[in-house]
Design a protein with these regions (language model features):
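Bacterial C-terminal helix-turn-helix
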Residues: 1-5, 12-13, 19, 24-77
């Protein structure tokens, strides 16, 4: 999947999310989307690197301490 396909998937999901609101006002969707994407991204990257946080942080383009904070936030061990 390339970046354009990922973007299309996000747009389709958001379109469905707004339809499902059924007139209710949306709230904090940025945080919702980031949380829905960030946790599995971190989990997958850690799995890909066999749990190596330094390699995962490098792949993600994050500082290792930032990765650790995000792991704590999402309860990832």
């Amino acid at each position: 999947m390339n970046q354009c396909e990922l973007s299309k998937s996000v747009k389709i999901s958001l379109d469905q999310y707004f339809k499902d609101l059924d007139g209710q006002p949306p709230h904090a969707i940025y945080d919702m989307v980031i949380a829905c994407v960030e946790k599995p991204l971190i989990e997958y990257t850690l799995q890909y690197t066999s749990g190596n946080q330094s390699k995962s942080a490098e792949i993600l383009g994050l500082n290792r301490n930032t990765l650790r904070k995000k792991m704590q936030l999402y309860n990832i061990e």
